[in-house]
């Protein structure tokens, strides 16, 4: 256990930041899963409604990833890699149909 006041404060601060970062990462993962699920549905039946859902979910996922990068929860290369994977998933579906 920490002995000094400053070390105790660092423990509290790092725990607070860890929980905040955890919630951001969880939200990013959730939105990515929802987007990939929408892409699968669009691949199964490419209707304009499904395309609109895909576009909406992509926008939400990109936004959350960018905010996580801005707040240094994710490294910018990690954020770029996640966005590239999302774009690639849609590109593969579009080229297949």
Curated annotation (Swiss-Prot):
Alphabetical GO biological process terms: translation
Domain of life: Bacteria
Gene Ontology, cellular component aspect: cytosol; small ribosomal subunit
Pfam families, sorted: Ribosomal_S20p (PF01649)
SUPFAM superfamilies, per the entry: Ribosomal protein S20
GO MF terms held by the record: small ribosomal subunit rRNA binding; structural constituent of ribosome
HAMAP family: Ribosomal_bS20
Protein name in the entry: Small ribosomal subunit protein bS20
Organism listed in the record: Crocosphaera subtropica (strain ATCC 51142 / BH68) (Cyanothece sp. (strain ATCC 51142))
Lineage of source species: Bacteria, Bacillati, Cyanobacteriota, Cyanophyceae, Oscillatoriophycideae
Gene, per the UniProt record: rpsT
């Amino acid at each position: 256990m920490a002995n000094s006041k400053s070390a105790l404060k660092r423990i509290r601060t790092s725990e607070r930041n860890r929980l905040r970062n955890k919630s951001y990462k969880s939200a990013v993962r959730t939105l990515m899963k929802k987007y990939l699920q929408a892409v699968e549905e669009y691949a199964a039946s490419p209707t304009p409604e499904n395309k609109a859902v895909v576009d909406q979910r992509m926008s939400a996922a990109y936004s959350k990833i960018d905010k996580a990068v801005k707040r240094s929860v994710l490294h910018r290369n990690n954020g770029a890699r996640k966005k590239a994977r999302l774009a690639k998933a849609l590109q593969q579906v579009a080229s297949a149909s």
